[in-house]
Each structure stands twice: as structure tokens, then as C-alpha cells.
Curated annotation (Swiss-Prot):
It is an enzyme of class 5 (isomerase). It comes from Roseiflexus castenholzii (strain DSM 13941 / HLO8). It catalyses: aldehydo-D-ribose 5-phosphate = D-ribulose 5-phosphate. HAMAP family: Rib_5P_isom_A. The active site is at 107 (proton acceptor). Coiled coil: none annotated. One of its GO terms (biological process) is pentose-phosphate shunt, non-oxidative branch. The gene is rpiA. InterPro entries: NagB/RpiA_transferase-like, Ribose-5P_isomerase, Ribose5P_isomerase_typA_subgr, Ribose5P_isomerase_type_A. This is Ribose-5-phosphate isomerase A. It holds the Pfam family Rib_5-P_isom_A. The keyword Transport does not apply. Keywords: Isomerase. One of its GO terms (molecular function) is ribose-5-phosphate isomerase activity. Catalyzes the reversible conversion of ribose-5-phosphate to ribulose 5-phosphate.
């Protein structure tokens, strides 16, 4: 079966955790797009009512408006009931690599603002150890780029400036740049996260550690739901 189908199935199952009256975080990326379309359908047919969403990117905001999903802000809803988003890699402890969609800063803020963070993914995103397949995105301010490149390389990464389809540097919604860092398998994600955060000029990184409450993963054998007993929020 098609990987797109698995992502759509995971998104549909994750929507079962949304209840009427909730304020929720709306993720960014292909799986999140399936979730947005499913959410719009449930709002349109009355299965859900009075749901408002905080988008994690301008891209998500545009699609949500097109679909008629009511939007809000963290100023109005600083505490969210739920956040739904995809992931680029998921390990057995529900530690994640995110950010290939370029929205990891807002995604992390929204996930941290939610009582529960539910990750939706196809089985292709499951790994034994983070870094097996994906680079680690690191968002940096333009002024700090040279320093960040040196420091990230010293940590064992191979930083590559992300560019858009035209070949120009990719610019995030916050006006920053992204270095896709190829570390290979990450032996100690917590230590690496701390080291990256200590680099002046780094705004955010794509390691989401201890944040996911539940992962909804779809594959050829159906859907599995993995809970993380040591997540910071249940």
C-alpha cells in the first residue's frame, strides 16, 4: 500500500482524540494536511463542534482557513487541550526528529503548550535510534550562521544550509535559516540536544524529547498506538 494512505489513516485515528470544545495545536507537513482535511470534515458534518486550532506555520494557517477550520492564538488559548503533528523519525521511547517541514520552532512551542501531544505517522517513520534516516534540522539566526556551522561540525554533525526549490536559502516563518545536520545515529539524544542549545545563535532544533504522549502509527498490518509512560505530559 501507499505510504500516503498510511499517513492518512494515522491522521484519521488521531482525530478520534479530539473532542468538541477543545483548543488544539495544528501541525505542519503532509500528515498534518490529512489531519486538517479530516478535522474540517468532522466539523462540517457536526461530529465535532466548537473546536479551534493554533497553527504551527503560515502554511497550516492558510490551509486551515481554506478548509473553514476556526483558528485562534496562544495569546487567547495559552493552554491547549491537545496537539496533533507528524514526525520525521520516532524511536521506541517516542523521542522524535521533526523539522523537515521547516516549522519546528512553532511546532515545539505548540506541543509544549498542550496537555497531550499526539504524533501521527506511517510505519516508515519508526526507527530504533534517532538519526538512522533523517538529518537533524537546527534553526539559526542569520548573524550566527558561521559560528553555528563550526560548533555543530565540532559536535560531529555535517551542517548543510537548507535551500528552497529556487536554490535560495530556506527562510522560516520567524525569518531564520535552517542547517540540516547529518550526525548519523545519535547515541545520546539528550546530551546532543543540550549541547546544541548551548550554541549562541541556535533558535531551535528538531529533537523532541519527552514531549510526545502517544504515537499513532499506521502500516500494512493496521494501526498501532504507542504510549510513552515517561512523557512529561500524559
Amino acid at each position: 500500500m501507499d505510504d500516503h494512505l498510511y499517513r492518512r489513516r494515522a491522521a484519521e485515528r488521531a482525530l478520534d482524540y479530539v473532542e468538541s470544545g477543545m483548543a488544539i495545536g495544528l501541525g505542519t507537513g503532509s500528515t498534518a494536511s490529512f489531519m486538517l482535511r479530516g478535522l474540517a470534515a468532522r466539523l462540517a458534518d457536526g461530529r465535532l463542534q466548537r473546536v479551534v486550532g493554533v497553527p504551527t506555520s503560515e502554511q497550516t494557517a492558510v490551509l486551515a482557513r481554506e478548509l473553514g477550520i476556526p483558528l485562534t492564538t496562544l495569546d487567547r488559548h495559552p493552554s491547549l487541550d491537545l496537539a496533533l503533528d507528524g514526525a520525521d523519525e520516532i524511536d521506541p521511547h517516542l523521542r522524535l526528529i521533526k523539522g523537515l517541514g521547516g516549522a519546528m520552532l512553532r511546532e515545539k512551542i505548540v506541543a509544549a503548550s498542550a496537555a497531550r501531544f499526539v504524533v501521527m505517522a506511517s510505519v516508515s517513520k519508526r526507527v530504533e535510534r534517532l538519526g538512522e534516516r533523517s538529518p537533524l534540522p537546527v534553526e539559526v539566526v542569520t548573524f550566527g550562521m558561521p559560528l553555528c556551522i563550526r560548533r555543530l561540525a565540532a559536535l560531529g554533525g555535517e551542517p548543510v544550509l537548507r535551500c528552497d526549490h529556487s536554490g535560495a536559502p530556506f527562510v522560516t516563518d520567524e525569518g531564520n535559516l535552517i542547517l540540516d545536520c547529518h550526525f548519523g545515529v545519535i547515541a545520546d539524544p539528550e546530551a546532543l540536544a543540550a549541547a546544541i542549545c548551548a550554541i549562541p545563535g541556535v533558535v531551535a532544533h528538531g529533537l523532541f524529547l519527552g514531549m510526545a504522549s502517544l504515537a499513532v502509527i499506521a502500516g500494512p498490518d493496521g494501526i498501532v498506538e504507542l504510549e510513552c509512560p515517561d512523557a512529561s505530559r500524559r
